Amino acid sequence: MDTAAPLPRVLVIGLDPYRVPGPWDPTPVAEGIAAGLARFADAGVGVETCLFGLDGSDDVEAVVTEALDRRRWEVVVVGGGVRSPDQLDLFERIINLLRRHAPDAAIAFNSTPADTFDAAARWLAPPG
């Protein structure tokens, strides 16, 4: 029996909930991300994450570019924190990086961290 993890087909780009400034509890979002990623494993679909902080510790464009260039992605999911109105500039930069570095990838948007698999599945080609 082959127990190797499937090759990643999906990249999830989003905010690291533990590195978003402000007085808020990141635990529910982190738990939602973990639950959403578990659904990929349950479906046998490989996934990688590209989570970055807004605390100034990341060169966001470099981090995202490195992740996009790592392999050919079938789907890239852009998380909701990146799409919030106060992050419009960041959202535009990420979409343009996607256009340049993963032009063949479908772009998907989740509505919550827990439904990230559903967002990707809308665009995944059937296996085989």
What is the role of each PLM region?
Residues 90-128:
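Ser/Thr/Gly-rich flexible loops in soluble cytosolic domains mediating phosphotransfer, phosphorylation
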Residues 1-22:
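N-terminal, charge-rich interaction modules
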Residues 49-58, 110-112:
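Short beta->alpha junction loops
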Residues 17-20, 55-57, 82-85:
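Short acidic, S/G/P-rich loop/turn micro-motifs used as interaction or catalytic elements
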Residues 55-64, 118:
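Structural motif
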Residues 62-97:
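Mid-chain, well-packed structural core segment of small domains
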